[in-house]
Amino acid sequence: MKLESSAELSQTTAPGEVFLGAVSDFTSAVPMEVATNPAIAFSTVNQGKLTFNAPPEVVARYFDDHQGWFARCAAPMQVQPMGQNGYTLVIGRFGSFGYEVEPKVGLEMKSHLPGMYTIESIPLPEDGELGYEVDFRSTMQLVEGHNNTVTYAEWKLDLKANVRFPQFIYTLPKGLIQKTGDRLLNQIVKQVSHRLNQKVVDDFHQNYSTQ
């Protein structure tokens, strides 16, 4: 796996590598050949925990104010607001077997109960032209730690992606495509979530924990 800055995105990457970074613009529509090919389903489930040195009510105010930090913490991924609680997020580039894609996804963050949040995928206007569909479902719960001075944000992500490939990909063994796609999806989620989680924790302690 390879993480790249926006300046490195034009470099050649060997087949089978994953590469992520900032992109100059949102993904354009895929060729008609790809859009009409049968989709292959990939999935991954991940979970983790963030630690904040503050009481739950302070951490909750931070997450409720996600318009103030989400885009900043998601960088170098490209973010555009969608309504009050939604965002269009361009993840970067990734690929395998010589095929590359720059995916974007619509996400909406909501608080249903105090200290409980969901992030779910929402439709994009051009969904039917992208060559893939993403089903993103994440839950997060704030848990009070020792003496009300520490808060844990426990999260779980269930991610499914249906991807349409160029015709030459379908000549490969189906089991190889499935195994490689699931593995790459899992690696991408782990890499992105690790970076985003760390940046959120750092951002909170630098800008919000004393409020």
Question: Could you say what each language-model-derived stretch is?
Answer:
Residues 2-100, 106:
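Hydrophobic ligand-binding cavity/cleft-lining segments
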Residues 2-4, 100-152:
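Hydrophobic-ligand binding "helix-grip"
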Residues 31, 36, 114-118, 147-149, ...:
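N-terminal plastid-targeting presequences
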Residues 51-55, 92-94, 110-112, 141-143, ...:
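Solvent-exposed residues in well-ordered beta-strands and their adjoining turns
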Residues 61-68, 75, 112, 190, ...:
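Short, intrinsically disordered, mixed-charge
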Residues 86-94, 120-124, 159-160:
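Generic short beta-strand segments
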Residues 128-182:
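Beta-strand/loop substructures that line and gate deep hydrophobic ligand-binding cavities in soluble
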Residues 170-211:
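A conserved amphipathic terminal alpha-helix motif
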